[in-house]
Amino acid sequence: MEPYRLRVPGRIEELVRRLHPGLKRKVRAGLDLIRTDPTVGKELRDELAGLRSLRVGKLRIVYRVAAKRLIDLVAIGPRRTIYQETLRLLRRA
């Protein structure tokens, strides 16, 4: 089966580029896992319903399945702040 395509905003590309090499490998492995099986992440609730979150070390990758075979990355960050940051990004959009 063909993997899903990822739509990655420039701000997320830049964040991943600046990560420590070990963490960058983990994030890329997480993204590959999401591309293969988008249901792997935990479904989020309440104001973040429709999004999913995958734990990668101390970081979370927040994403949504946007269309047939397309995944939108929404945010990547530490658990402590990622959900508030995601809400802020969604309200601005």
Predicted regions and their residues:
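Residue-level signal for pocket-adjacent positions within structured domains
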Residues: 1, 39, 43, 77
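Arg/Lys-rich, positively charged N-terminal/basic patches that mediate binding to nucleic acids
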Residues: 1-25
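Enriched for short, Lys/Arg-rich terminal
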Residues: 2-6, 59, 64-93
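A secondary-structure boundary/capping signal
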Residues: 8, 44-47, 57, 78
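Nucleotide phosphate-binding site architecture
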Residues: 13, 45, 83
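Short, intrinsically disordered, mixed-charge
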Residues: 21, 33-36, 88
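A short, surface-exposed loop/turn module that caps and links secondary-structure elements
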Residues: 29-54
